[in-house]
C-alpha cells in the first residue's frame, strides 16, 4: 500500500532501498524555506542496520503489512529453536542467535507471535512477563533497610536480575522480558 512520506508513523514497516525497514522515530520538520519533510530513523528488519532518511510529503513509499502468526515453543536442539503452528501443526526452526538474548525466557509450551513477510520470519514477540524461580541469591543483611537497595539474583534460566532484599532463594517471581527486570512475587 503506497503512503505519502509525511504519513510514516513509528512502528510502520516500509520497503526502502530494496529492503524492509521499520520506522523507529519520526520527526516532522517544516523549515522556513522549502517544503515540509519527515525525518525518519529506520531500522533494517533483516540485519538490524540503522538509517536516517528524509521523506518529502510529495514522495510515496510502499508500506508493508507483516503477517503475524501464533506459534508454540517446543524445544531447542543444537542452537535451533523449534516452534509449532497451533493451527496446522507445522513446525519452524529459528536460530537461537537470531532470537537473541530473549531466547533465555522461552519455556516449554509458551505461546509466541512470529512476524513474517513472504514466508521469511522477521521478528518474534514473547509474552511481556514470565514467572521464574530464583536459584541463587544473597541472604538479607539485617538492618540494611535505610536505603532501598536491590541485590543480584540468579534465575532458573541463568539470567541475573536485581531483586528487593526480602526475596529469597526458591521463590518464584514475575520478570519483565523486555527490560529483564523484577516486577513482583508470583502468586
From Swiss-Prot:
It comes from the Bacteria. Keywords: Cytoplasm, Elongation factor, Protein biosynthesis. Its main location: cytoplasm. SUPFAM superfamilies: Nucleic acid-binding proteins (SSF50249), Translation proteins SH3-like domain (SSF50104). One of its GO terms (biological process) is peptide biosynthetic process. InterPro entries: Elong-fact-P_C, NA-bd_OB-fold, Rib_uL2_dom2, Transl_elong_fac_P/YeiP, Transl_elong_KOW-like, Transl_elong_P/YeiP_cen, Transl_elong_P/YeiP_CS, Transl_elongation_fac_P. GO terms for cellular component: cytoplasm. It is found in: Cytoplasm. PANTHER family: ELONGATION FACTOR P, TRANSLATION ELONGATION FACTOR KOW-LIKE DOMAIN-CONTAINING PROTEIN. Belongs to the elongation factor P family. This is Elongation factor P.
Amino acid at each position: 500500500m503506497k503512503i505519502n512520506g509525511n504519513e510514516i508513523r513509528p512502528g510502520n514497516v516500509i520497503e526502502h532501498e530494496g529492503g524492509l525497514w521499520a520506522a523507529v522515530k519520526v520527526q516532522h520538520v517544516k523549515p522556513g524555506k522549502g517544503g515540509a519533510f519527515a525525518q525518519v530513523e529506520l531500522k533494517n528488519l533483516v540485519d538490524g542496520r540503522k538509517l536516517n532518511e528524509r521523506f518529502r510529503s510529495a514522495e510515496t513509499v510502499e508500506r508493508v503489512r507483516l503477517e503475524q502468526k501464533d506459534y508454540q515453543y517446543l524445544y531447542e536442539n543444537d542452537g535451533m529453536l523449534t516452534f509449532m503452528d497451533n493451527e496446522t501443526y507445522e513446525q519452524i526452526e529459528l536460530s537461537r542467535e537470531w532470537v537473541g538474548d530473549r531466547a533465555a525466557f522461552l519455556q516449554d509450551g509458551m505461546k509466541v507471535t512470529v512476524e513474517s513477510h513472504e514466508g521469511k520470519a522477521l521478528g518474534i514477540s514473547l509474552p511481556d512477563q514470565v514467572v521464574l524461580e530464583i536459584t541463587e541469591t544473597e541472604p538479607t543483611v539485617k538492618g540494611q533497610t535505610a536505603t532501598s537497595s536491590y541485590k543480584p539474583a540468579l534465575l532458573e534460566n541463568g539470567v541475573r536480575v536485581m531483586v528487593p532484599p526480602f526475596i529469597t532463594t526458591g521463590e518464584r517471581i514475575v520478570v519483565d522480558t523486555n527490560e529483564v527486570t523484577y516486577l513482583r512475587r508470583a502468586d
